[in-house]
Amino acid sequence: VLIFAQTTTYVDALYNILEEIYPSDVTRYHSQVKPERRKKQLLFDFLQGKRKIMIATSAFSMGIDVPDIELVVHFNAPISMTDYIQQIGRAGRDGRKAHCVLFYDQNGDDDAISNSFIKKTKKQSPKVAKVIKAKLSQVHDFIHSDSCMVCDILEYQGQHETKTCKRCTVCAQKRRNSK
């Protein structure tokens, strides 16, 4: 299981909660884990299967190849569609079945985190803040879309697919509502 959280604070909070429930199965990975040797050991434990649950920021998704991840959970909305696609791509390797879950609180922390991030960035670079705002807008559009999620992801990547997957949350909800 791979759980992504938007901030190191969320990673640590989730780790503390899950560590109580699954004491020897949980690990975490983010930039504030020190020393570097400890961070490498935590990663190694997960990659070797000694720990079954990894809670991490987006830094974890780049270049990590774990063949048997069956579930990717986003505790917060990712900052961009590119991040989202990169992170869900950690699951279902080599044709294996996997699931991805995205939790989103539109009236709470997710929008607050996004707005705070944009505000901090705007002070340093208004141009970068504008790009980040556009990327966050794409994620919000994806979350609120009533189209097949797979089709939306493919379209974001420049492919056009008219046949729905019939398995994503949106397709399943439409199927239930049509009965």
Q: Can you annotate each of these PLM segments?
A:
Residues 24, 120-179:
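C-terminal accessory/connector segments of nucleic-acid motor ATPases
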Residues 1-123, 161-163:
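Helicase motor core with emphasis on the C-terminal RecA-like subdomain
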